[in-house]
Amino acid sequence: MQLNFKRSLALLLLSTSMSVYAQQTYTARVVNQETGEPIIGAIVSSSNGEKALTDAQGRFSLPLNENQTIRISYLGFTPQSVNSKSFRNGMVIGLIPGIDLQEVKVTASISSARSKKALGSNVEHVDVSKLTANEHANSLSDILDGRVGGVQMYQSNGKVGMPIRFNMRSGATISMDRDPIIYVDGIKYNTSHISDINSSQDALSALNDLPIEDIASIDVIKGPSAAASYGAEAANGVIVITTKRGSFNTKENNKAAIQVKMSLGAASLARKYNQFVNNDPLNNFFETGWQKNLYGTVSKSFRGNQNMFFSYNMNDVEGIVPGNRDQRHTTKLAYDIKSGPLSVSATASYVHGNISLPQTAMGRYDAIWNLMINQTPWPYVEESTWRAQSWTYNNDRFLGNIRLGYLLPGAVKLETVIGVDVNSTKGVYRLPYGYLLGNNNEGAKNVSNRRNSSFNWDIKASRRFKLADKWNLTATLLSQIARQYETVNAINASRFKGDVDNIAAATERNVSENTFEQRTWGLYGEAFVNYDNRLFINAGLRRDASNLIGSNVASIYYPSLSVAYNLENQKFRLAYGESGRLPYPTDARTSYVMDGISAYGPTVKPQFKGNPNIRPERMREIEFGTDWTLAKRHNLSLTLYAQYTSDAIIYENLLSSDGWIGSIPRNVGRIKGHGIEFGYNGLVWKDTNKHSLDVYANVNYQANKVTDTGGSDITNYPNVIKKGYPVYSFYYHTVEKTALNADGTYNTKMGAVESSDYKYLGKPFPAVNGSFGFNLKLFSNITFGTKWNYALGASVYNQSFYNTAGLGDNLKKRNDQLTALANATVGTPEYEKIANDLAYTARFRANYIEKADFLRLSNLNVGYDFTSLARKLTNNTITSMKLSFSVQNVFVITNYSGADPQVEGNGGNRKQRGIGSLSRDITNAPHPRTYTATLSFTL
């Protein structure tokens, strides 16, 4: 017995000593494979459960047994696994920046984020942090335009703070409300533009408050096939913005990470005017606009799985139009905590802005019109009067959310998000006393106070079920309550006795107040099936209810279905979905106004006739696509889609003889659309880790056609909605011949003879558009990149030149023709040719609907990474440093004769009742060329 005990004890000691001998503590270092810089906070885990984080030098220590595997991962890098057999003390492990595109987490629906390989639709993900590291961006359009297939977006004109026009896929809708829904960290963002004290073209964009430097990534959901889960307003797609926050991958006892980014830039007129007899006053009117930006962040992890992120952004941007300036301060605080089954995230950001938006277009008293129309400038208003006026908006905006997640018993995951967006804006227009504007030299002052707010509360429950071997089902149920409320009161005062700041002293005053409220409730159910991580099937159904008047608006259903199948290097996807657009708030309401007083009391008369049976517009979309990965370096994507819009709202004119004025809405419109999207990005050249060349390109084709208008055309000439033609087509009389007097001389009053019929003259959307560019790295430290945008097939109504040709004397082409005509002999072939040419420069709409094809070098950037030198000189106090220089809107090649082929006279897209207009150049301010130098460093 004693002998057996001694033998057992000896064996135990021997095995223990062998185990201790087999397990050793290894030390290694993790670096960026391309730059050699240490990666701080990388997660190192072994197959037996041991974990470690890399320190400030990228080092870690971990006990390992023989034949174990360790995995090293860090956000933004491809994870790497190493077997302990090949592990050596002091070895250096390099992580490759970037991750497999199919593994990128993107917003799949309102209820979930999934890897791209699980998506049946083409949802595009943009890593904004990476983009803004090399190039400067002032607006959302600078980031997304040209980088997302099937999407075209640009500012309506070249001033600071202007609205953005969105062209999403085929644009198969009659509605002027063409903006996508925008979410920021789960907050439904209010996108209403503000034009309370100026014209719609010079409106203040709601997107001006977006914190560009704070954006980490953007997911773009382009159509109903993917956006059906977002309900009744998602036909234009959804843009999901995720802002920066702290990371759980950093050590608790690490010092706070501090990042600073400083930019200094200048904007100037990109294309000088040469289309006029006297160009100097117009070219000299524009000035250099200086731009300053300071951005700083502090992030820190704390004990107990907590982290905090703080940022501050100062933006001071001047435009090229005198007086156009945007001064904005933004602060943001984000907090995250994970404790067992509970996770809590909260975000609060505050924007204080002051922007001056001088009015330069849309009226006879505006600057560009007065500089363009006549050879002698300022015919309708004195320059001193225009410069004395001021249009300013002061706005304060708060964005806040709280997100809670909890894992209930039974593996049910419960999540809720509450989001708030509150924007208060005060607009003030001033015409000082003593300056003559029209017939008023006694001053004017308009004041508006607006409060736009949005609230959303989302709550969802989800659970994963194992159906069979390799088969899994995730079921989700989500409820969303949303409220949008807008109120504005305004007072317009004029004709003072002196100081215009005392509104009570005005002899003419007008007060107005308007409110708008929209409440919606959506219930969304989703079933997501996963087979062997290769086949993914997603089915969803959304039911929406709204407070808008109308029996058919109270309850609406939107289904969706998608399938994705993955091979080793290729994915096939198919998706179908439905969404829509809600009617205008007053479409279902019949209203009357008081007409007087009778012996029996007040009398009323009809004002607007509503349609209580009005339905939301419905868009159905199906898309098919495939994605390839070739040689692990090249990624290609091809998507084909078709859209079918029914119940489009057409406004039929009412007969005044029936006692009504205006129009009544009816669901009689139908439109079809289709398109193709092709994208490529790849690493086409790499030499060790010092040199590389990345190339990207996308090509998009889109078309739409109106198939029903209820039997009548809807016109806002030269834009029309007409069966058989694209929506908002240009459709008008054409010029047939010149106008001659009986003696053979040119009739300058008539100008030309128009055709009696109408003809199709173009459309406001390009048939083909896209972008291409490259990013080059040399010697590890030097970067050089470009982005080119192009479009073919769109037209623009050049209303600026149309008016100048007939109402002024400054259009050079026509002026030269008139001069040549005066020197020619009546009745000669030369005279007849010049007279015929004059017919096509006369003030007729068809003469000024122009092709607007273009190729634009949108961005050119170069940078140098000083990290190694900075670390050496500061003893690692500065952990990274980069200097970059970028130029935006370098040049454009176009067949459009106006200031810029990408302008929008109505100020972008907006909510309005009835047909509007698209692609009109109404003395729009041109887009500037911008130069920006940026220095960024991390402590």
Residue ranges and their predicted role:
Residues L264, Q291-N313, V317-N324, R328-F398, ...:
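Flexible loop and strand-edge segments within Gram-negative outer membrane beta-barrel domains
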Residues A267, A791-K882, V887:
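Extracytoplasmic gating/loop element in the C-terminal half of outer-membrane beta-barrel translocons
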Residues G49-R59, T107-N134, G161-R165, H193-S200, ...:
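N-terminal periplasmic "start-of-domain" segments of outer-membrane beta-barrel proteins
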Residues V31-T35, A42-S45, S73-F77, R88-L131, ...:
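Short, acidic, small-residue-rich periplasmic hinge/interaction motif at the N-terminus
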Residues S61, I187-K222:
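Short acidic/polar hinge/loop motifs at secondary-structure boundaries
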Residues Y273-P281, M362-S384, V428-K445, Y485-E513, ...:
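Surface-exposed loop/turn segments flanking beta-strands in extracellular/periplasmic regions
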Residues K261, G265-N278, R666-K672, K686-P764, ...:
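Conserved small-residue
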Residues D142-K188, S217, A227-S247:
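Extracytoplasmic beta-strand/coil segments of soluble accessory domains associated
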